[in-house]
């Protein structure tokens, strides 16, 4: 009887050495995001982080999210360096809505076969997103799972924790009729609606490399999600922000009501901004109804802020100084009975 060939984990499709190489590659990206509250170094069983001492009654705010099927486009077109920014943005933009300063972030990267170069590019993007939001990348998990994913496909998930002073939590309870609504421009579709985006590409048989307003269509579609944290933290400090809505899945119709009292509705002037070209292209080439566009995509509006009408000019000036494109998009009105909570005129 012949002696069986000894098996290793690598024979089963899991390369521990590749995982170690990835950890080595990302150390600089992680170090760049370090905050003074972080304790210990990368590689521990658990990641430690103190709460900043400036908070008297700190409340922790947590969020988790992914990038959705935008990853399919990124994988197909081998554009891996920005989806990590998307991952962070989807989490930290949700935290800032409640007034929370992001503290730390952890990522989960799952794949069938670990490609160190691809994974390094992705995690470096996560580090860039954390840097943009002032958030420490303190840990994560890389799971190589042969048989679970096709080829070198991968999926991402992120988890973020932030902190806000208990007295300063923004929960929409101060929103009242007469408040103004300010919009902050998006960078593109961000990370929502990509199953519909891909369907439009399929049905229209469009060339993703075709020119749209001076750059390839695929670059518009893979533009990373804008991170609003630093500019909105300054606005919160300087103004009286009553509510914020991150325009993600569900678009205008579902996200704005999440931060409104039952007796209030948002009245939005649909002609107060021009849709970026990518949304007009999607609408035309997919024959998508306007209602569906507002339900699926941000249509050029990544964040909406509600605040007193007399604070608008100062808020717009501050946001402009922070590099944000922002404009007055509408107002809060009294809601009667079962009226819809969002009207776009």
Curated annotation (Swiss-Prot):
Tell me which UniProt keywords the record has, alphabetically.
ATP-binding, Cytoplasm, Ligase, Nucleotide-binding, Purine biosynthesis
- Set out the biological process GO terms recorded for this chain's protein: 'de novo' IMP biosynthetic process; adenine biosynthetic process
Which pathway does the record list? Purine metabolism; IMP biosynthesis via de novo pathway; 5-amino-1-(5-phospho-D-ribosyl)imidazole from N(2)-formyl-N(1)-(5-phospho-D-ribosyl)glycinamide: step 2/2
GO MF term set: ATP binding; phosphoribosylamine-glycine ligase activity; phosphoribosylformylglycinamidine cyclo-ligase activity
Coiled-coil spans are none
- Primary subcellular site in the record, as a coarse category: cytoplasm
Using the UniProt record, name the top-level EC class of this enzyme in a single word.
Answer: ligase
Q: Where in the cell is it found?
A: Cytoplasm
Q: What is its EC number?
A: 6.3.3.1
GO cellular component terms, alphabetically, are: cytosol
Task: Fetch the InterPro entries from UniProt.
Answer: PurM-like_C_dom (IPR010918), PurM-like_C_sf (IPR036676), PurM-like_N (IPR016188), PurM-like_N_sf (IPR036921), PurM_cligase (IPR004733)
Please give one Pfam family short name. Answer: AIRS_C
Q: Which residues cross the membrane?
A: none
Claim: Ligase is one of the keywords in the record: yes
Kindly state which reaction or reactions the protein catalyses. 2-formamido-N(1)-(5-O-phospho-beta-D-ribosyl)acetamidine + ATP = 5-amino-1-(5-phospho-beta-D-ribosyl)imidazole + ADP + phosphate + H(+)
Range of residues in the leader sequence: none
Which family does the record claim for this protein? Belongs to the AIR synthase family.
| PANTHER family linked | TRIFUNCTIONAL PURINE BIOSYNTHETIC PROTEIN ADENOSINE-3, TRIFUNCTIONAL PURINE BIOSYNTHETIC PROTEIN ADENOSINE-3-RELATED
The entry's protein name is: Phosphoribosylformylglycinamidine cyclo-ligase
The species this protein belongs to is Shewanella putrefaciens (strain CN-32 / ATCC BAA-453)
């Amino acid at each position: 009887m012949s002696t069986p060939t000894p098996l290793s984990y690598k024979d089963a499709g899991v390369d521990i050495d590749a995982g170690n190489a990835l950890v080595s590659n990302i150390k600089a990206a992680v170090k760049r995001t370090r905050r003074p509250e972080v304790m210990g170094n990368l590689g521990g069983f658990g990641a430690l982080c103190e709460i900043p001492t400036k908070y008297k009654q700190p409340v922790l705010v947590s969020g988790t999210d992914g990038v959705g099927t935008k990853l399919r486009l990124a994988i197909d077109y081998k554009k891996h360096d920005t989806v990590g920014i998307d991952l962070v943005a989807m989490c930290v933009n949700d935290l800032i809505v409640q007034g929370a300063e992001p503290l730390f972030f952890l990522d989960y990267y799952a794949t069938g076969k670990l490609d160190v170069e691809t994974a390094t590019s992705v995690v470096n993007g996560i580090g860039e997103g954390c840097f943009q939001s002032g958030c420490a990348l303190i840990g994560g998990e890389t799971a190589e799972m042969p048989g679970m994913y096709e080829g070198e496909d991968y999926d991402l998930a992120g988890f973020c924790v932030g902190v806000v002073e208990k007295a300063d939590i923004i929960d929409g309870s101060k929103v009242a009729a007469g408040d103004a609504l300010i919009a902050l421009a998006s960078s593109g579709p961000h990370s929502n609606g990509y199953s519909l985006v891909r369907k439009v590409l399929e049905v229209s048989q469009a060339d993703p490399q075709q020119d749209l307003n001076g750059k390839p269509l695929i670059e518009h579609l893979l533009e990373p999600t804008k991170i609003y944290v630093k500019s909105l933290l300054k606005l919160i400090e300087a103004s009286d922000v009553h509510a914020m809505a991150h325009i993600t899945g569900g678009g205008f119709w579902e996200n704005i009501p999440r931060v409104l009292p039952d007796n209030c509705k948002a009245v939005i002037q649909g002609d107060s901004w021009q849709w970026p070209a990518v949304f007009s292209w999607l609408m035309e080439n997919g024959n998508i109804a306007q209602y569906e566009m507002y339900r699926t995509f941000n249509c050029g509006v990544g964040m909406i802020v509600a605040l007193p009408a007399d604070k608008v000019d100062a808020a717009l000036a501050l946001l402009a100084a922070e590099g944000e494109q922002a404009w007055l998009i509408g107002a809060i009105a009294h809601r009667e009975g079962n009226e819809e909570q969002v009207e776009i005129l």
